[in-house]
Amino acid sequence: MLRWLKTIFAKIVYLMTEKDFFSPPYPVSKNEGKSIWKAPSNIALIKYWGKKENQIPANPSLSFTLSSCATTTIMEYRRLEKRGTNFDFDLFFEGKPMESFRPKIETFLKRIEVYLPFLKEYHFKIETSNSFPHSSGIASSASGMAALALCLMDLEKELNPEMEPDFFKKKASFLARLGSGSACRSIEGDLILWGADQDFPESTDLYAIKYPFEVHEVFKNYQDTILLVHKGQKQVSSTVG
């Protein structure tokens, strides 16, 4: 019976494609502004292990967001007098310039430029901080890329005020995925599914969704205890896995 209902539901579910995330001409211009977002890290109950081309997961994953582990990003933006040929941004982590993060942000911006065509029209000052050590296995890249994607979507929402809230979240997840796969699961909580699965008609490889079915009460008070034994970087990433 449940599978039959899922089959019927699948017929009315519209799954967004990459083309849906291309931006129309913007009706509004914005010279400068500021956006602040706090995004949670997440811990996978079912982990993806390895990715295909274009940040597509090798298998679906299911995760909980972590209420006490988060990244806060403040993004200030100012329109340039002339559109640049390169991305123009300054990056600070915990109040200090962080040049070692620049290549990853550059790669992220290159991947998403086709979906956010305004990126080379602005100078960005990006300030980010974590409530936990980065690169130690607590998915700081997930919360960091999610927070940055949300800030960039804030700017696009300013340029396109008619944007629907549901589309805002889906595109933020879509963009975050292109920065770090698990980042697409950090846009909202609490139980999140990423990756196409035949038993979940709304699921897709392009962005994460809330787990769409009833969750047992025992999982609504689920706890994750983090014990730090070393603050160094983990040796094996999910991408390599």
Question: Over which residues does each language-model region extend?
Answer:
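ATP-binding N-lobe of GHMP and related small-molecule kinases
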Residues: 5-136, 150-161, 165
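ATP-dependent small-molecule kinase catalytic core of the GHMP/sugar-kinase superfamily
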Residues: 164, 168-241
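Long, hydrophobic, well-ordered secondary-structure blocks that form the structural core
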Residues: 126, 134-186, 190-193
